[in-house]
Swiss-Prot record:
The lineage of its organism: Bacteria, Pseudomonadati, Pseudomonadota, Gammaproteobacteria, Vibrionales. HAMAP family: Aldedh_AstD. GO terms for biological process: arginine catabolic process to glutamate; arginine catabolic process to succinate. This is N-succinylglutamate 5-semialdehyde dehydrogenase. The gene is astD. It catalyses: N-succinyl-L-glutamate 5-semialdehyde + NAD(+) + H2O = N-succinyl-L-glutamate + NADH + 2 H(+). Pathway: Amino-acid degradation; L-arginine degradation via AST pathway; L-glutamate and succinate from L-arginine: step 4/5.
């Protein structure tokens, strides 16, 4: 059974859907996509359940979420193995993701109270009350790179606020979505409070176009997110929150400090998860001169020796395959395109078996108009620069704005960088691929429109209701002009 609708597991009636390991082609999961009628049934089930769920005390909603958290902890190894098999990420990495699913729940509960709870104050003889009310039925679209951690960063705040949910995982990771839905089922959520619909483009279109949803929380590619943005134009009654990618720059100062620490920071920023994190560094700005040369020599040498293997290999690999052979071919094509434009490969990516490729480092300094694209994989573009001001100007030359970083021991350089850079996540001497669940996640421009993750997700799962209240009506000593009683 493929879909969880109105408290029942049902088979899909749409096109066939399969999930294979990206490292061995082993069949992991198969089923049939949700048809438009089944998506509609899921939305209607969520609408019916909303009427009761929103009225339940917060403590009861919280108890269901905490029960889910305990189930995640008890099944964390199974979750980690499923994610590793579907995505190809090393097991050590997916174990971290499984732990983060439960860990983020505590943040979401605290955020509910601090950002969307209820406050009361007195002013001029009036009682001023701020309450928050759920939006209604929320559609949640999950990505493939963090198929457990990221969608639950939307699902949990939505449920805590009193919304009901229709969840569509990535078509690349349906098994992970099903495993997590089984845990929500075991947590005892009432029928229809959360629903699962599996499928690819047609299923997603049907869900996004449904008149029955009140909001949509999306994590994924800029291309899909921009289509959703156009689709939602003219519908101010629906909340749309988009988390998308970036063409993220990291500037290496001449004052970068320890060589090995800097190289390690770059590798962690560019090649972790095989470059399949939205915050990964895509453009590396390196100073002209001997210090920049030494850095690049060491970076290329270390990157060429990175261990690449399947998720369960011993010794453990740093990188696994990409999520699919199509994704791997896209990176190889991007490399060829950049070479054709005048880029010089310092380390050329090579196709291995299945969806494995080796990482690429390419000097694109000579390219006059560098394509402003997010290459979602292990491809790092290097640009040599003369001054920090020039590097920052080049770094800002993008329609995206998700993350950016500076590696420098000079406080003055950091002050200049943080004042002039345009990005939502800006790190100093730290990898770009780490983010705090307590902090806003997202960026301006083509990287998204809101910050609907973790602590700040609460803001987009409920609307504020402001009230001025009194026990009785009041008759003022002086009436408004033109009124006689």
């Amino acid at each position: 059974m493929t879909h969880w609708i109105a408290g029942e597991w049902v088979a899909g009636t749409g096109e066939k859907l399969e999930s294979h390991t990206p490292y061995s082609h082993e069949l992991l999961w198969q089923g049939y996509s949700a048809s438009g009628e089944q998506v509609d049934a899921a939305v209607k089930a969520a609408r019916r359940a909303f009427l009761d769920w929103k009225k339940r005390p917060f403590a009861e909603r919280e108890q269901k979420v905490l029960a889910f958290a305990e189930l995640v902890k008890a099944n964390s190894e199974q979750i980690a193995q499923v994610i590793a098999k579907e995505t190809g990420k090393p097991l050590w990495e997916t174990r971290t993701e499984a732990a983060s699913i439960a860990g983020k729940i505590a943040i979401s509960i605290r955020a509910y109270h601090e950002r969307t709870g209820e406050t009361v104050r007195e002013a001029a003889g009036n009682q001023l009350v701020l309450r928050h009310r759920p939006l209604g039925v929320m559609a949640v679209f999950g990505p493939y790179n963090f198929p457990g951690h990221l969608p639950n960063g939307h699902i949990v705040p939505a449920l805590l606020a009193g919304n009901t949910v229709v969840f569509k995982p990535s078509e690349q990771t349906p098994w992970t979505g099903e495993v997590l839905m089984q845990l929500w089922q075991q947590a005892g959520l009432p029928a229809g409070v959360i629903n699962l619909v599996q499928g690819s483009k047609e299923t997603g279109i049907a869900l996004a176009q449904s008149r029955g949803i009140d909001g949509l929380l999306f994590t994924g590619s800029a291309n899909t997110g921009h289509l959703l943005h156009r689709q939602f134009a003219g519908q101010p009654d629906k909340m749309l929150a988009l988390e998308m990618g970036g063409n993220n720059p990291m500037v290496i100062s001449e004052h970068y400090g320890d060589l090995d620490a800097t190289v390690y920071t770059i590798i962690q920023s560019a090649f972790i998860s095989s470059g399949q994190r939205c915050t990964c560094v895509r453009r590396l700005y390196v100073p002209q001169g001997t210090k920049g040369d030494a850095l690049l020599d060491k970076l290329v040498s270390v990157t060429a020796k990175l261990r690449i293997d399947q998720p369960f290999a011993e010794p453990a690999p740093f990188m696994g395959p990409l999520v699919s052979e199509a994704a791997a071919q896209a990176i190889l094509k991007a490399q060829a395109d950049l070479q054709a434009l005048g880029g010089k490969s310092l380390l050329e990516a090579r196709a291995l078996h299945a969806a494995f490729i080796t990482p690429a480092i390419i000097d694109v300094t000579a390219i006059e108009r560098l394509p402003d694209d997010e290459y979602f994989g292990p491809l790092l573009q290097v640009v040599r620069y003369q001054t920090l001001a020039q590097a920052v100007e080049l770094a800002n030359d993008t329609r995206f704005g998700l993350s950016a970083g500076l590696v420098s021991t000079d406080d003055g350089e950091w002050d200049y960088f943080v004042e002039h850079i345009r990005a939502g996540i800006v790190n100093r001497n730290r990898q770009l691929t780490g983010a705090s669940g307590d902090a806003p996640f997202g960026g301006p421009g083509a990287s998204g429109n809101l910050r609907p993750s973790a602590f700040y997700a609460a803001d987009y799962c409920a609307y504020p209701m402001a009230s001025m209240e009194g026990d009785t009506t009041l008759l003022p000593a002086t009436l408004s002009p033109g009124v006689e009683l």
